[in-house]
Swiss-Prot record:
GO terms for biological process: diaminopimelate biosynthetic process; lysine biosynthetic process via diaminopimelate. The record marks 44, 107 as: Part of a proton relay during catalysis. This is 4-hydroxy-tetrahydrodipicolinate synthase. CDD domains: DHDPS. Pathway: Amino-acid biosynthesis; L-lysine biosynthesis via DAP pathway; (S)-tetrahydrodipicolinate from L-aspartate: step 3/4. One of its GO terms (molecular function) is 4-hydroxy-tetrahydrodipicolinate synthase activity. Its EC number is 4.3.3.7. Belongs to the DapA family. It comes from the Bacteria. GO terms for cellular component: cytosol. Transmembrane segments: none annotated.
């Protein structure tokens, strides 16, 4: 089971929106060197809705090949079409990804039975461990804990990323999930709380700019060193908050750019961070000790 801080890595782009694959490789090295425990590539933060299928597959392949087994690579393979999700998951397996992260289908609003059949079909079609991803703030459809736990019994479905930020729901999953079913928060703000209670890790946006701190925070929370986890939490608290001052990944891409790690490119319909919010994100980077 993968534990700790798992970065939901951004996808570097030039200012014209084209992929910057050299910066992408450098970012992968940066995370390996800074202690990130695993990498999710082409997830929400990686702008999966605005890369085409060819680019999506290219990014997965580059990540797997460049990381070369140094840490696990989890491929974002979700889609609002079951057939497309299966195709992406099949590619991830062939590319050598360790796992797939598959988001709840968005826009078409499936029922709980539809969600069950969707993820079951993926797991049955491809022999690659699948992590479910529930983020109702984006997908509208909200996968219930009952459906998650029903899917936990399906061979090949090995965990869930719960991005609801709801502690009550997290506690219910901890109490009822099989012991070998991985529980990850997708909400940095509640990472210390959920990991302290029994979650296994954090699939993190903040880790894009503070990988070492997020790794240390997750390790401290998991080991019961609440004083250290609390200290780091408050050091990065403004990042947890202000990296969402506009829609993710707008603020975090600007922040990674300010650290000198990539150009300031993003694809429409997303636009770069507004001038009004730039001082806010810069102040959060300063509070975390990441810039002077």
């Amino acid at each position: 089971m993968i534990t700790g801080s798992i970065v939901a890595i951004v996808t570097p782009m030039h200012e014209d929106g084209s992929l910057d694959l050299n910066s992408f490789r450098n970012l992968l090295d940066f995370h390996v060197q800074e202690g990130t425990d695993a990498i999710v590539v082409v997830g929400t933060t990686g702008e999966s809705p605005t890369v085409n299928v060819e680019e999506h597959c290219e990014l997965i392949k580059i990540a797997v090949d460049h990381v070369a087994g140094r840490i696990p690579v989890i491929a974002g393979t979700g889609a609002n079409s079951t057939a497309e999700a299966i195709e992406l998951t099949e590619f991830a397996k062939k590319a050598g990804a360790n796992m797939a992260l598959s988001v709840v289908p968005y826009y078409n609003k499936p029922t709980q039975e539809g969600l069950y059949r969707h993820f079951k079909a993926i797991a049955e079609a491809v022999e690659l461990p699948v992590i479910l991803y529930n983020v109702p703030g984006r997908t509208v459809a909200d996968m219930s804990n009952d459906t998650i736990l029903r899917l936990a019994e399906v061979p090949g479905i090995v965990g869930v990323k719960d991005a609801t930020g709801n502690i009550d729901r997290a506690c219910d999953l901890i109490a009822r999930a099989p012991k070998d079913f991985a529980l990850y928060t997708g909400d940095d703000m509640t990472a210390v709380a959920t990991i302290s209670l029994g979650f296994h890790g954090d699939i993190s946006v903040t880790a894009n700019v503070a990988p070492r701190l997020m790794h240390e925070m997750c390790v401290a929370a998991a080991s019961g060193d609440i004083a250290k986890a609390r200290e780091i939490h408050f050091k990065v608290l403004a990042l947890h908050r202000d990296l969402f001052c506009e829609a993710n990944p707008i603020p975090v891409k600007w922040a990674v750019h300010k650290l000198g790690l990539m150009p300031n490119g993003i694809r429409l319909p997303l636009t770069t961070l507004s001038e009004a919010n730039q001082p806010r994100v810069l102040a959060a980077l300063r509070q975390a000790g990441l810039v002077a």
